[in-house]
């Protein structure tokens, strides 16, 4: 399943999101959701413990001036890669 987080992780039900993640799932952080990928934060550690593939939309990190602060464990992707993930994961859940 493809999960997308578009709001700040501080305004999302992160516990429910983490419980719903399963092996083989992917999580794309976009819009204000990219805040979850900041290095050194407790949220990124919780996401990394979930053992799913983590992505952040590069245009959104750039728009917020955060690209250099994104964890190296998060793959920065563009719109084309995002579309490819939607093809690979027909089931999707937006948070």
Curated annotation (Swiss-Prot):
One of its GO terms (cellular component) is sulfurtransferase complex. Keywords: Cytoplasm, tRNA processing. GO terms for biological process: tRNA wobble position uridine thiolation. It holds the Pfam family DsrH. It is found in: Cytoplasm. The keyword Methyltransferase does not apply. Its main location: cytoplasm. The keyword Cytoplasm applies. Gene3D superfamilies: DsrEFH-like. It comes from the Bacteria. Part of a sulfur-relay system required for 2-thiolation of 5-methylaminomethyl-2-thiouridine (mnm(5)s(2)U) at tRNA wobble positions. NCBIfam families: PRK13510.1, sulf_tusB_dsrH. Heterohexamer, formed by a dimer of trimers. The hexameric TusBCD complex contains 2 copies each of TusB, TusC and TusD. The TusBCD complex interacts with TusE. Belongs to the DsrH/TusB family. This is Protein TusB. It comes from Pectobacterium atrosepticum (strain SCRI 1043 / ATCC BAA-672). The gene is tusB.
């Amino acid at each position: 399943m493809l999960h997308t987080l578009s709001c700040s992780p501080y305004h999302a039900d992160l516990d429910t999101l983490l419980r719903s993640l399963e092996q083989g799932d992917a999580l794309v952080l976009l819009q204000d959701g990219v805040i979850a990928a900041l290095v050194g934060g407790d949220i990124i550690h919780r996401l990394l413990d979930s053992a799913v593939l983590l992505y952040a939309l590069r245009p959104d990190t750039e728009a917020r001036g955060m690209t250099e602060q994104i964890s190296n464990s998060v793959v920065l992707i563009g719109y084309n890669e995002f579309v490819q993930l939607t093809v690979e994961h027909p089931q999707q859940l937006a948070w």
